[in-house]
Amino acid sequence: MTVVELSPFSMLVPLIASAVCALLPGRLWPWLLTFAAAAASAVIAAITLAAAMDGPLSYAFGNWEPPIGIEYRIDAANAFVALLVSAVAAVILPWAKTSVDQEVPERQGPFYALFLLAFAGLMGITLTGDAFNVFVFLEISSLATYALIAHGQDRRALLAAFRYLIMGTVGATFLLIGIGFLYMMTGTLNMVDLAQRLPELRDTATVEVALAFIVVGMGL
């Protein structure tokens, strides 16, 4: 397996582990699986970063070549961010275990499954080279985060999760509208392709509105 073929597994490992984690009983096994998945993702991200220092890596899902297919395009910058995200996830888990035991005293599998989903979403946002997939991974991460907030024993946790859901939904809608406008103007969702086509359209009102929607959506 080449580094290019290995690179998507920094997102796929926590995504697959989340499905398994939801079924695990007790406290220890879900935590161990979550820590192992985060550590494995960090190792893969480190290997990817080392390879990306020599030039961008491109992985086309389903052998559909970009810009038609979905592309993972990894350069040194986003590979470093992926390593940072995965390393932080792995480092905080041992320290967070005591707090999780207090907040979720019973079966912790679903809690750690949601954590892994949120983590996988963040990794997907970092690595994808497709604008619509940024939206998809953002929604995966956001929905998992809403559920994590609602896990708190304090009754205010549900209200906080609901407020977060409303704000997140509005923000995601703005983001999707902005991406839709960009697609309407350029005919592509591939970020490299967008970067090549947008300079010719930068003074058009539609592109300016699209960027405004994206900025507001990400801000919310």
Question: Where are these predicted regions, by residue range?
Answer:
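Transmembrane helix-loop-helix hairpins at membrane boundaries of multipass inner-membrane proteins
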Residues: M1-P8, I16-A113, V192-Q196
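Alpha-helical transmembrane segments of integral membrane proteins, especially early/N-terminal helices
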Residues: A36-A50, F132-V136, T169-F181
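Transmembrane helix-loop junction
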Residues: A22, A50-A51, A150-H151, M184-M185
